[in-house]
């Protein structure tokens, strides 16, 4: 970014808070910007919404869901990072302005009736790129 941060390195470093906490505390945390409590709390609200949507998607499309990352931070290992942890690392690198826009997008989707599940929307576009018309069609094609 414009102040010299390597955002990709920082994102993966932030994920280490869960996957390798001792290394994170010693070798990463002192060198990356600390998030305010308010920002961290707002991020956790966004993360909770997205994890709920991913869980809902997996329940409705279990075969497609099998190909996804582990869902929650409690499932992290040193070699496997969950969707929740990955998202936390990603959002932690966003500027305040970018995060505010992302937060608003998630809020708009959550407030819609019915809600617009971003996991479902993303996976629908993905399976359409693979030649399927619908998620149901893609789910049925899985073995």
Go through each PLM region and give its residues.
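Short, structured motif recognition centered on aromatic/hydrophobic residues
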Residues: 1-12, 46-47, 91-107
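Residue-level detector of alpha-helical secondary structure
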Residues: 13-16, 25, 29-32, 36, ...
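N-terminal hydrophobic signal/anchor transmembrane helix of membrane proteins
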Residues: 35, 40-58, 143
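EF-hand and EF-hand-like helix-loop-helix modules
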Residues: 49, 123-124
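Terminal low-complexity "docking" segments
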Residues: 54-69
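Eukaryotic low-complexity, mixed-charge intrinsically disordered interaction/regulatory segments enriched
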Residues: 68-90
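Short, surface-exposed polybasic-aromatic patches that bind anionic ligands, especially phosphate groups
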Residues: 111, 115-121, 138
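Solvent-exposed beta-strand motifs enriched in subsets of small alpha/beta binding domains
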Residues: 125-132, 137-142
């Amino acid at each position: 970014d414009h102040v010299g941060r390597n955002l990709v390195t920082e994102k993966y470093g932030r994920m280490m808070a869960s996957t390798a906490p001792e290394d994170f505390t010693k070798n990463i945390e002192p060198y990356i910007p600390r998030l305010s409590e308010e920002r961290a709390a707002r991020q956790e609200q966004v993360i909770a919404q997205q994890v709920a949507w991913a869980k809902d998607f997996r329940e409705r499309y279990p075969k497609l869901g099998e190909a996804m990352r582990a869902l929650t931070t409690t499932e992290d290992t040193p070699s496997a990072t969950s969707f929740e942890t990955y998202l936390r690392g990603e959002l932690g690198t966003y500027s305040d302005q970018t995060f505010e826009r992302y937060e608003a997008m998630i809020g708009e989707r959550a407030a819609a009736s019915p809600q617009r599940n971003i996991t479902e929307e993303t996976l629908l576009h993905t399976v359409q790129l693979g030649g399927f018309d619908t998620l149901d069609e893609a789910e049925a094609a899985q073995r």
